[in-house]
């Protein structure tokens, strides 16, 4: 499963399930919100949630008054479900951008992003060229002083998710990927308990572009 087309089909199939049946479902994205609150963003700040799936994070951000939110995912099935839910619950037209972060044709056109949020996306990119493309994309779209929030499986985390192999990370690996232009603001480890009761150790990081 190493072609973009196959991966789209894989994720589309996953998101045909109910959200609560997904191994990464969070009813309360508290760890992500903890880092977002550290940023002290303006309510019209440009927030890009990559690999959003059908996340409830966007509901929470809307509830906090943020108005400029962009959702990205490889799966249009996920984005359609997310967009329809947000429209129905909040009468808000969510900007959804289907795109492959390792070979971007749309996200790369965005500029001056104030906050990049990635929970559990980067660790699916196994090839060095995919990882380099991901980090280059971040550098290209981020505003100066913009924040990058990355939460991925830590080195002692699971080796697979949703049937796919993972590249697990520590802080040094993430810093190396982002480069010296990004300063670490905060990091912590967090063990997420998924809907099936399994432990999933994560490393959460927040960087700022200098």
For the regions a language model picked out, list residue spans one by one.
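Short catalytic micro-motifs in class I SAM-dependent methyltransferases
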Residues: 120-124
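Class I (Rossmann-like) S-adenosyl-L-methionine-dependent methyltransferase catalytic domain
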Residues: 1-111, 125-141, 146-210
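A conserved beta-strand element that flanks and buttresses the S-adenosyl-L-methionine
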Residues: 117
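Conserved acidic residues
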Residues: 114
């Amino acid at each position: 499963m190493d072609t973009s087309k196959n991966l789209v089909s894989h994720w589309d199939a996953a998101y045909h399930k109910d959200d609560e049946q997904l191994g990464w479902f969070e009813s309360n994205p508290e760890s992500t919100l903890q880092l977002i609150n550290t940023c002290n963003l303006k309510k019209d700040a440009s927030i890009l949630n990559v690999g959003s799936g059908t996340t409830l994070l966007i509901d929470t951000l809307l509830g906090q008054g943020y108005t400029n939110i962009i959702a990205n995912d490889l799966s249009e099935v996920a984005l359609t479900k997310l967009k329809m839910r947000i429209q129905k619950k909040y009468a808000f037209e969510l900007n959804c951008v289907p795109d492959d972060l390792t070979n971007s044709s749309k996200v790369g056109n965005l500029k001056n992003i104030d906050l990049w949020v990635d929970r559990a996306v980067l660790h699916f990119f196994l090839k060095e060229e995919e990882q380099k493309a991901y980090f280059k994309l971040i550098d290209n779209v981020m505003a100066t002083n913009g924040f990058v929030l990355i939460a991925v499986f830590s080195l002692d985390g699971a080796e697979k998710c949703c049937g796919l192999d993972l590249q697990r990370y520590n802080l040094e690996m993430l810093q190396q990927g982002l480069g010296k232009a990004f300063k670490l603001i905060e990091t912590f480890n967090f063990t997420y308990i998924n809907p099936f009761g399994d432990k999933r150790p994560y490393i959460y990081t927040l960087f700022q572009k200098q």
